[in-house]
A protein has these predicted regions:
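Glycine-rich phosphate/adenylate-binding loop
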Residues: 14, 20-159
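Single conserved hydrophobic/aromatic residue that forms the stacking wall/gate
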Residues: 1-13
Length: 159
């Protein structure tokens, strides 16, 4: 069920996650889940990208899938790993299409599915994602009731 076009537009345009660090991704997820607002997650690193959409009551949230942010230095920063600019264009365009589909109420959203893209192989895959009924934010008995401020190294693009 898609809300009216005007309410859908205000929901989607304010909640597109293309951030470059896990604390921000979890903060966006948690804030949207608490507010009952949909959002789209996207991430890239090197030649790979991923995308999923969360709609309240229609599938898993980001935390259902990824549980908690990784330890502070467990995942390389953008500077360490590298980001291919064209990947932002590919995944960003797909994320924009998710917003358009939501707004106009057409097509199948990536709710309950993670779309992955491997640019080196030119392959897309869709992974079915179940809702975690034990999820700390959207599960049957949530344990997170306020936003958490995680700390992690930011993607330093200026040095």
């Amino acid at each position: 069920s898609t809300p009216s076009n005007s309410s859908a537009a205000s929901d989607v345009y304010k909640r597109q996650d293309g951030t470059d660090n896990f604390p921000a991704k979890f903060l966006i997820n948690d804030a949207c889940v608490m507010a009952g607002k949909p959002f789209s997650h996207a991430g890239i690193i090197r030649f790979k990208g991923q995308l999923m959409t969360y709609v309240p009551g229609e599938g898993p949230c980001y935390r259902c899938v990824f549980k908690n942010p990784p330890p502070k230095d467990a995942v390389p920063t953008c500077k360490q790993a590298g980001v291919i600019g064209a990947m932002g264009g590919v995944i960003g365009s797909l994320q924009a299409m998710e917003a358009i589909k939501y707004i106009i109420g057409k097509g199948d959203l990536l709710t309950g599915r993670l779309l992955t893209y491997d640019a080196l192989k030119m392959e897309f895959h869709t992974i079915k994602l179940p809702k975690d009924h034990h999820c700390a934010i959207c599960g049957d008995n949530p344990t997170i009731h306020e936003l958490i401020d995680y700390e992690q190294a930011e993607c330093d693009m200026h040095k």
